[in-house]
């Protein structure tokens, strides 16, 4: 498959030279740290982070992470959020000469950290299911451009949205968050959503690959699975992701759903080379950033020790590790794995090249 997706950065010869130069200027420790995407509390060891000062700077110097994911408890007002994000980004620029991915889960409706938050004069745009039910894909474009319009001035450069999941089972987890119940409805909505975010000047992330909308249960607390074959997934679940990739989505989040009829085992997609490397990178030709869903979720938490979880995800082919439990130990675990040859430095460089390419385009 031809390589598609990834940053809008023209992969010109000069652009790629700048990316390669930047990657080679980083130490192994810095490169591995760029693959981690914690909450600010996990980086700093504090109970609640609402500013970025000396504590953040010291913690970042120790582990210069590639991104931070913010939640409602971090966001009290527009001026506070702007200051915190601007200071956080400056720390990253000072330490590694790269901006920080600063993300939020702003899907609209039930999953919103800014819209409807009492500290912000921003209305919640509502659930994506209501948008999908209109049958008008322009609505998805308008809503996502509107979300970008209030996130960008605060300093966010990445939204963990849109949901490309199809609700084709009895799962309540995605019932309101997804655009609908068939690929015919969801795919054009996802395409328009991605365009809306990108035109609004923010990176976005299609999730939760290869689609968690039909699974029983909630991966937040428990293991979930699908008994579909790869052919069945190709007909429905994968279609919105293919459309997102064709539209230039810069990032895809892999969910914690087991696909035993595809992989032959019970490993969740986020830790499965068959799903991440063979299907998403290989068959779908996605060359942007692949990030895991939160590695603190119940679906994966009990499978490995924290450090082994991070190593397993990288070996599956992911580029970034979201909300890894025990950040310091996980980081050290990946460094140890590179030093003992379990993971090659070339493998780390592949991921960091994708991260740097996207960051230099911000």
Language model region names:
Residues 1-61, 282-283, 302-362:
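Preference for extracellular/luminal or secreted protein segments
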Residues 47-52, 231-245, 271-276, 300-304:
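A general structural motif
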Residues 189-210, 229-249:
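Phosphate/pyrophosphate-binding betaalpha-module
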Residues 41-43, 47-49, 58-188, 208, ...:
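Enzymes and membrane/adaptor proteins characterized by extended Gly/Ser/Thr/Asp/Glu-rich
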Residues 30, 39, 72, 89-92, ...:
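Sec/Tat-exported extracytoplasmic proteins
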Residues 277-290, 294:
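Catalytic PLP-binding core of fold-type I/II PLP enzymes
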């Amino acid at each position: 498959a031809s390589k598609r997706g990834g940053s809008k950065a023209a992969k010109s010869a000069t652009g790629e030279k700048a990316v390669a130069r930047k990657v080679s200027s980083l130490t192994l420790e810095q490169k591995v740290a760029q693959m981690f995407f914690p909450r600010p509390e996990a980086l700093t060891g504090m109970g609640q982070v609402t500013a970025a000062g000396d504590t953040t700077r010291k913690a970042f110097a120790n582990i210069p992470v590639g991104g931070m994911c913010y939640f409602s408890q971090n966001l009290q007002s527009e001026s506070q959020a702007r200051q915190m994000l601007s200071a956080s980004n400056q720390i990253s620029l000072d330490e590694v000469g790269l901006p920080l991915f600063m993300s939020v889960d702003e899907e609209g409706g039930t999953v919103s950290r800014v819209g409807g938050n009492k500290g912000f004069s921003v209305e919640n745009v509502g659930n994506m299911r209501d948008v999908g039910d209109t049958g008008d894909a322009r609505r998805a474009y308008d809503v996502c451009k509107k979300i970008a319009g209030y996130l960008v001035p605060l300093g966010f450069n990445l939204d963990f949205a849109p949901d490309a999941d199809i609700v084709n089972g009895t799962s309540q987890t995605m019932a309101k968050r997804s655009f609908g119940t068939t690929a015919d409805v969801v795919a054009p909505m996802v395409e328009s959503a991605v365009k809306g975010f990108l035109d609004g000047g923010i990176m976005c992330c299609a999730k939760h690959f290869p689609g968690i909308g039909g699974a029983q249960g909630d991966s937040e607390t428990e293991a979930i699975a699908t008994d579909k074959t790869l052919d069945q997934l190709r007909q429905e679940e994968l279609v919105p992701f293919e459309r997102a990739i064709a539209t230039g989505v810069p990032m895809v989040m892999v969910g914690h759903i087991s696909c035993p009829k595809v992989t032959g085992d019970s490993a969740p997609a986020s830790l499965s080379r068959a799903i991440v490397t063979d299907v998403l990178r290989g068959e779908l030709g996605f060359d942007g950033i692949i990030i895991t869903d939160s590695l603190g979720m119940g679906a994966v938490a009990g499978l490995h020790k924290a450090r082994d979880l991070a190593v397993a995800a990288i070996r599956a082919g992911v580029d970034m590790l979201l909300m890894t439990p025990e950040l310091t130990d996980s980081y050290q675990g990946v460094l140890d794995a590179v030093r003992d040859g379990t993971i090659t430095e070339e493998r780390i460089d592949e991921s960091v090249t994708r991260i740097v390419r996207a960051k230099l385009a911000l």
